[in-house]
Amino acid sequence: MTTTDQILALAAHPTATTEADAGLARFAEAAVAGMNTHVVRALRALRPADDGPAWRAWLSATAALSAPGGAAASGAVPSGAAPSGAAPGGAAPADGPVVTTVVCAAATALGEDCSAAVAAGLQAAALAEAGLATAAGWSVPVVSAAIGAGLAAGLMLGLGAAQLRSALGICATQAAGLRAAAGTDAAPLQAGKAAFNAIEAAQLARLGFTSSREPLDGRRAFFPLLSS
């Protein structure tokens, strides 16, 4: 079973978890605390009007990570793993601040009842992270969060298996983020953009956009590219 297949298996029976609920609570508090940071003000200056859920996810994730005392403020980009709720293949749900923020931002921008989608997204991010052990130079939390957030967004939009596969591929082809950005304004910005891209990918998949059937493990796909 490929990593993409393992992630899609998570979508079959998504279940709310205490880890997801706790992550959502932390995210909501941090997003409010960071909404007046200079990074968020700069983003708002580019698009002063509400520009849909993807834009709201970008703003909220950036706000949460640029809040005073947040992960970006300290220059940290940890990922970590929760001790319970293992995903297929043995990966525990990723619950580092960057991963959790990106997944929660994507899910909450699309609805309120999102604990199950967030739980599945955190597990998907952990599976993506496990394949990026040698991704030197890349911000592994950000690029793996893009995959997890894509699954969460797809679940919130009610996508079927084929559409979810396409959404994951669209996320993978746009995944980016540099370790060198840690401690700068670009760190929360690139994490927020991952949440934006995740929602956009799910929306495009719902409209019929396609992508690689094996966007993660394929010979010219996500893992080989980022680990080269």
Say what each PLM segment does:
Residues M1-S228:
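N-terminal core-entry segment
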